[in-house]
């Protein structure tokens, strides 16, 4: 029976340490301050923005929300990013995704100053991860690494299968695991032999948004399973993994909710503080 990787618990431990860092900055007259640009009325995005704001307040961080209408033009969003980039009182900028179809989200991300890039998704910061010369990382990927580290799950020499190739989770978590000398395979929607790959994996990270994709027959005994998926099935939030059955074979497994999600939010706050310290010559 798999031991639960409790992301909420780890996030709260990290949160207490981060509060002290914020307190130290405030004693020097510096308050971490970031902005979230949310375009449109996506209900899930609005919930996520509010969740971040609550966490920011708990950490002592200022978060401003720029709520733009769904029909916002690209140039308006770009001009707002330019304004925030140039404001010395703003330490971080992020664009809430997904954006409406008329918006080129990639162009918005490219416009963010890499030194204010809370999400770690500007091209230069993504590139730095692969060059192993990074100062900011996408929050979910960094949260997964922190979770494994807390539970003393070593990556060196392990066979890892990452299911999903997004810039937000799949690619960066693969890069961070390679950096720690894991042997990483990235699978995706066109992978034909997924079960064959996962059965040989010591660690599986699934980030596809496909409910119950990973089943008991696809994993070996003692596997570590990190489920990043968030899917609604019959009014219930579930992951990519058939949790109840896979946990019988896993040595460690994350629940959904309460696994990776709280760490994603926490590491966004960690990023804001890291950027603030960097901009003020503290690291």
Swiss-Prot record:
Binding of NADP(+), residues: 164-166, 189
Listed GO CC annotations: cytosol
Cross-referenced InterPro entries: Aminoacid_DH-like_N_sf, NAD(P)-bd_dom_sf, THF_DH/CycHdrlase, THF_DH/CycHdrlase_cat_dom, THF_DH/CycHdrlase_NAD-bd_dom
Subunit field text: Homodimer.
EC number: 1.5.1.5, 3.5.4.9
Keywords per UniProt: Amino-acid biosynthesis, Histidine biosynthesis, Hydrolase, Methionine biosynthesis, Multifunctional enzyme, NADP, One-carbon metabolism, Oxidoreductase, Purine biosynthesis
Catalytic activity: (6R)-5,10-methylene-5,6,7,8-tetrahydrofolate + NADP(+) = (6R)-5,10-methenyltetrahydrofolate + NADPH; (6R)-5,10-methenyltetrahydrofolate + H2O = (6R)-10-formyltetrahydrofolate + H(+)
Record function comment: Catalyzes the oxidation of 5,10-methylenetetrahydrofolate to 5,10-methenyltetrahydrofolate and then the hydrolysis of 5,10-methenyltetrahydrofolate to 10-formyltetrahydrofolate.
GO molecular function annotation: methenyltetrahydrofolate cyclohydrolase activity; methylenetetrahydrofolate dehydrogenase (NADP+) activity
Pfam families in UniProt: THF_DHG_CYH (PF00763), THF_DHG_CYH_C (PF02882)
Domain of life: Bacteria
Protein name: Bifunctional protein FolD
Family: Belongs to the tetrahydrofolate dehydrogenase/cyclohydrolase family.
Keyword Oxidoreductase recorded: yes
GO biological process: L-histidine biosynthetic process; methionine biosynthetic process; purine nucleotide biosynthetic process; tetrahydrofolate interconversion
Pathway: One-carbon metabolism; tetrahydrofolate interconversion
Biological source species: Lactobacillus acidophilus (strain ATCC 700396 / NCK56 / N2 / NCFM)
